[in-house]
A protein has these predicted regions:
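FIC/Doc superfamily catalytic core
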Residues: 1-193
Length: 193
């Protein structure tokens, strides 16, 4: 793993720590972190295909805050109040993650389930395609491992096969064990990722 570590990132980490120390506690730093958290929350929902947002509206929400009034008619494909709820869930999950790290709690499968529950708090269904190729809505199980297969289709028509439901619990245990081994060996974050 040593070959994968980036010496450049280590120096950037030092620069960031120095700048953070200078700015911490200032209004500028607080606003920067708020905008960054909103951007992460909004982009997470877009990446997960929970909603679509126009780029201009995305920037407006990042800069001005999560206000339903900022969503024009036609700027999203879902009801505006629902989109704001989903974004708020993503932001709250991020805040919870920061608290988790600050408390130095060890990563566990129970925490991952807790995080999942928070991320999807206002999401009751997930859009899916059944074995016959039909678009369906299936109830979303919150805070637990998947119970049904989810193998997405690629643009070329092939299927990308994810871990089968019956193996998810053991694979997640294995992932947590790998993480703990990386922490113990002080593996750099960019390698662990």
């Amino acid at each position: 793993w040593q070959k994968l570590a980036s010496s450049e990132l280590a120096s950037f980490k030092g620069i960031w720590a120095e700048q953070k120390q200078k700015l911490e506690g200032t209004e500028q730093f607080r606003r920067f972190n708020e905008r960054l958290a909103r951007e992460w929350a909004i982009e997470t929902g877009i990446l997960e295909n929970l909603y679509e947002l126009d780029r201009g509206v995305t920037q407006l929400l990042i800069e001005k805050g999560l206000d339903e009034a900022l969503l024009d008619h036609g700027s999203t494909n879902k009801p505006t109040d629902y989109v704001i709820q989903l974004i708020t869930d993503q932001r709250d999950a991020l805040e919870g993650l920061f608290d988790f790290v600050a408390q130095r709690r060890p990563l566990s499968t129970s925490y991952l389930k807790e995080l999942h529950h928070l991320l999807v708090r206002n999401q009751d269904y997930v859009d899916a395609i059944d074995t016959l190729g039909r678009h369906v809505r299936t109830p979303l199980v919150k805070g637990d491992w998947k119970r049904l297969p989810n193998n997405p289709s690629r643009p070329d028509g092939s299927t990308y096969v994810y871990c089968p439901p019956e193996h998810v619990a053991s694979e997640m245990e294995r992932l947590v064990e790998m993480h703990h081994a990386h922490v113990e060996a002080t593996v750099p974050a960019e390698v662990s990722a």
